From Swiss-Prot:
One GO cellular component term noted in the UniProt record for this chain: DNA-directed RNA polymerase complex
Pfam families, sorted: RNA_pol_Rpb6
InterPro entries the record matches: DNA-dir_RNA_pol_omega, Pol_omega/Rpo6/RPB6, RPB6/omega-like_sf
Subunit structure: The RNAP catalytic core consists of 2 alpha, 1 beta, 1 beta' and 1 omega subunit. When a sigma factor is associated with the core the holoenzyme is formed, which can initiate transcription.
Gene (UniProt): rpoZ
Protein name as catalogued: DNA-directed RNA polymerase subunit omega
Catalyzed chemical reaction(s): RNA(n) + a ribonucleoside 5'-triphosphate = RNA(n+1) + diphosphate
Region of interest (Disordered), residue spans: 1-20
Role played: Promotes RNA polymerase assembly. Latches the N- and C-terminal regions of the beta' subunit thereby facilitating its interaction with the beta and alpha subunits.
Amino acid sequence: MSSTSAASAAGQGALPAYDTPLGITNPPIDELLERTSSKYALVIYSAKRARQINDYYNQLGDGILEYVGPLVEPGLQEKPLSIALREIHADLLEHTEGE
């Protein structure tokens, strides 16, 4: 008897096979696309912001503070791209197409 049929037999119903991954699925891509003119603009927008966040972390040891750090509370070991996508989703950034 498989584990799925065993769970059904026990009356528990179907259980998810895995946890929902974080990152690109949170915030949802459809909601992010509402904030830009195209998926390509979203890629460029988020990549530029992720690079700024990465440069911010790299310069902390030098004491220069030329770049702006994360505008949302970063999670433990959260990647700069995930932080940038959360900032875009929260409308914390201003973006002009073509820049």
